[in-house]
A protein has these predicted regions:
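Aromatic (often tryptophan-rich) hydrophobic motifs at membrane interfaces
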Residues: 31, 62-72, 80-88, 196-298
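Divalent metal-dependent hydrolysis catalytic cores, especially in the metallo-beta-lactamase
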Residues: 94-102
């Protein structure tokens, strides 16, 4: 493999190596070179999925962002080549659907995606600014009082670095996402490998040594990205584990000097979304961008084109 570019964890050699050691996941990296130098690279993650409904076994590919490019590279010329290469490769592998999210600009790559049969779906993303105000300055007096009250009750947090803590956190994630069919929780190996990276933190929220919440945050390009989060909201409703988990993620991001905390998944693009409304309560800013989807069965793409005419 040629000497790859550095600067975006989601398209890095480090993440590629973590993913290739994780059962149930296959990473693919498209690389563009010019005069034996890498000028662009794009990482896509292929997940092996199971479903109670047809298709019972399928694969789903996800790319986070448009890739990474050399400072002097012609991104507008290289991006279509990388996108086409990965799309053709995944199509040959009968990948059920491909998804691109976290695009830096709403209209970036619009023409290229359309040419390859992708469908744009308007998706609301949320981020909290940490550089202009402290996180607590965006909270209501009621929220601040509640957080102080929960801390007095004994709720604490720590980074999950030991195998035991990571196992308990992984069990929490699996139970939390069990009925959320669109979300995929990687094998425990993934979180073990992430815990050794300087770009990632797995954090657990505890009460009397019981894990009631947790999250995985990626620190990348001066920002924080909340990749996974889970909490036992119903079991410990009196302890508000959902609020304590999101609040801790915001506090940690601010301590790490992140400019923003981005929620990588604020829920489905429905008019009424309780989770989205919940995280907006922490002072976040909603921004509508496109997520791009391409399904292997052409009939699904045709249906989506009809439903999401832009």
């Amino acid at each position: 493999m040629p000497h790859l570019l550095e600067g975006d964890f989601f398209h890095s050699l480090e993440l590629f190596q973590i993913l290739e050691k994780t059962p149930g996941i296959t990473p693919f990296m498209a690389v563009a070179t010019l005069e034996n130098k890498v000028v662009g690279q794009m990482l896509v993650i292929l997940y092996q999925r199971k479903s109670l409904f047809p298709p019972y076994l399928y694969t789903h590919a996800h790319a986070y962002g448009e890739g990474l490019y050399a400072p002097d590279a012609e991104q507008n010329a290289i991006f279509p080549l990388l996108l086409r290469s990965l799309t053709i490769h995944l199509h040959k592998r009968l990948c059920f659907y491909i998804e691109f999210s976290r695009m830096s600009k709403k209209m970036l790559g619009y023409r290229e995606f359309r040419k390859l049969g992708y469908v744009p779906i308007a998706w609301q993303e949320i981020h909290n600014s940490l550089h202009s105000k402290l996180p607590q300055e965006r909270l209501s007096d009621k929220q601040i009082a509640m957080i102080k009250r929960m801390k007095k009750k004994g709720i604490s947090c720590r980074e999950a670095t030991s195998p035991e803590d990571i196992h308990r956190y992984h069990q929490l994630l699996k139970n939390y996402y069990r009925l959320k069919l669109r979300r995929f929780v990687p094998d425990e190996t993934f979180f073990q490998k992430l815990s050794t990276s300087s770009n990632a933190r797995n954090v657990i929220i505890t009460y009397k040594d019981k894990v009631i919440g947790g999250y995985t945050c990626i620190y990348n390009q001066g920002n924080a990205f909340l990749w996974f989060s889970a909490f036992k909201r119903k079991t410990y409703i009196h302890l508000h584990p959902d609020t304590m988990t999101i609040w801790q993620a915001l506090s940690d991001a601010q301590e790490q000097d992140a400019q923003h905390l981005h929620f990588m998944d604020a829920g489905l693009p429905l008019k009424s979304n309780l989770y989205r409304e919940f995280i907006l309560g922490f002072g976040g800013k909603p921004v509508t961008k496109f997520r791009w989807f391409r399904f292997y069965p052409k009939v699904i793409n045709l249906l989506l084109h009809w439903l999401y005419k832009d």
